[in-house]
Amino acid sequence: LPFVRMIFFILVASSLYFGLHYYIYWSIVRSIALSTAVKTFIKICMILGGLSFFSGEFLRRRSGLEFLIYGGYIWLGMISISFTIFFFKDILSIFLPEYRKILTYASMVVSIVAISFAILQVKQPPMLKEIQIPMPRLAIEKSGFRIIHLSDIHINHFTSKEWIETLVEHVNLQNPDLILITGDVIDDHLDRIKEFPPLLRQLKSKHGVYVVSGNHEYYGGIQHFEEFSALSNFHVLNNEAITIDNCLHVVGIPDDTASSFSLPGPDLTKAMANIQDNQPVILLSHKPVGFPEAVQKGVSLQLSGHTHRGQILPLNLLVPLTFKYSYGLYELDTSYIYTTSGTGLWGPPMRIFTSSEIVSIDLISK
């Protein structure tokens, strides 16, 4: 059954992916008179570019083909952003048909500018997002307890040592009491990213680093994540809770992707079974789902990631339609959920209308 689901997903994703290519091609040729030679050239570019992403994905574990993988991700981002711009161009052309040709040329220029901006955006280090969250059950002497929330780092063989070193430096400057990571830490096999655990061991917090799995940990093999975490001095929470500084509980559940690999999925009831007192409970859950149920079980704060805040067009527009708590801080009764845009990137090395972030959370006794 998992194999059948995978084949179905690949077929649907492939159809959508190449459909985007055809749409852009169609949008151009129906608006501008082009010679047969130019049309053929565009078709060849679309086919080769489209195949570069799939070829890179299938061959991503092979060394020496990094250029193909990276180029494929760049192409994926270019197509996604361009599709969005051309789609809105075609809607506008319905009302302004006499300007269709001009709008098409303008769309080409806007696409180039947007793609360039998206690439330049990720050259910047993650921004620091500082928030304060009221915590009614937190002892007054613990007010100001500082948590650094990271998520979706997606460490792979494209990740640079300099980027990790900068991340560690920026986190340590915040002098956190606790570092919490909500999944998708790695996106590769351990033997291809083994230089990073020694760098991540330099993360400093008074009460350690705790982490849960994301969906990508299962795609590459959960054992790589577990070994990577152990080497990095990360404590993995798998349907379990830990008491921190005798003032709050941190509960971690695995991503629901675990069930697709015949592994135990998230079980919040089991994870909270041994919590008997009235101290605040912080839940680590990769996807920003299940928050109302978590509140009913006594969770004070849920930390999540996964959405990347869309990362690029058109996902920026679609993610809020898919996830109710897609980005930022939300309140329900006296509990909160914070969904981060992510510390790193997945796929295209681009961001537009969103930034990578390090989240610094001060818990305020109330």
Where are these regions (language model features)?
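N-terminal signal-anchor transmembrane helix
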Residues: 65-71, 93-150, 156-169, 173
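Soluble catalytic domains of enzymes that build or remodel membrane lipids, polysaccharides, and related
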Residues: 138-366
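Non-catalytic terminal accessory segments
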Residues: 1-124
